[in-house]
């Protein structure tokens, strides 16, 4: 923070430099050559140390007033859940991030039991359903060490929740997919 990284890199390289977050870079990578190829509107999420998002609508990556459009980590998915660093209770990041999983289980996320993997997927599906219902998108692409590490139980639970909560004509059939580029998605997008 408070370091002019883009300016310094531009001075040294002579290139145009833009600094952004991993989830927005994931959105670009997945849209170019990953699971979202051909989609004009979608959400890309990283579920890892934190929970972030990048949002593409009508072919454009959204920035937002502070550059954080699509940041789904602070969508409340469990109002009675633990307090989040932002001050709210039950934000997705407070219940689904790697540190949250470790607090819950007392072990690294890689050692989480199947029921925790499914519950985490369910909560991510709930947040994605909010975005799908609000913005009329049909796809969420998810990466990050927690999501990809939890694998099929995570993605199956996420899709089941999405199916339950997206019953409108224009939201029915929305999908949650693992990032086609895996952990390399943000690098490709950068």
Where are these regions (language model features)?
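Short glycine-rich anion-binding loops that position phosphate/pyrophosphate groups of nucleotides
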Residues: 48-50, 146-147
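Short glycine-aspartate micro-motif
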Residues: 18, 42-46, 52-54, 83-85
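N-terminal glycine/serine-rich phosphate-binding loop of ATP-dependent small-molecule kinases
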Residues: 1-25
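Active-site glycine-centered loops adjacent to acidic/histidine catalytic or metal-binding residues
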Residues: 22, 48, 190
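Short, intrinsically disordered, charge-biased short linear motifs at domain edges
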Residues: 68-77
């Amino acid at each position: 923070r408070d370091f002019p990284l883009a300016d310094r890199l531009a001075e040294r390289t002579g290139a145009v430099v833009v600094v952004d977050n991993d989830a927005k870079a994931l959105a670009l990578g997945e849209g170019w050559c990953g699971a979202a190829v051909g989609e004009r509107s979608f959400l890309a999420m990283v579920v890892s140390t934190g929970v972030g998002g990048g949002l593409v609508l009508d072919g454009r990556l959204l920035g937002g007033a502070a550059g954080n459009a699509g940041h789904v980590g602070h969508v409340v998915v469990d109002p009675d859940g633990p307090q989040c660093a932002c001050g709210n209770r039950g934000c997705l990041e407070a219940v689904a991030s790697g540190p949250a999983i470790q607090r819950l289980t007392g072990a690294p996320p890689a050692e989480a039991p199947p029921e925790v993997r499914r519950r985490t997927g369910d909560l991510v599906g709930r947040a994605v359903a909010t975005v799908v219902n609000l913005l009329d998108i049909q796809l969420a692409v998810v990466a990050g060490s927690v999501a990809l590490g939890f694998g099929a139980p995570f993605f199956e639970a996420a899709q089941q929740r999405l199916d339950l909560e997206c019953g409108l004509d224009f939201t029915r059939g929305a999908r949650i997919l693992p990032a086609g580029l895996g952990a390399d998605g943000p690098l490709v997008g950068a």
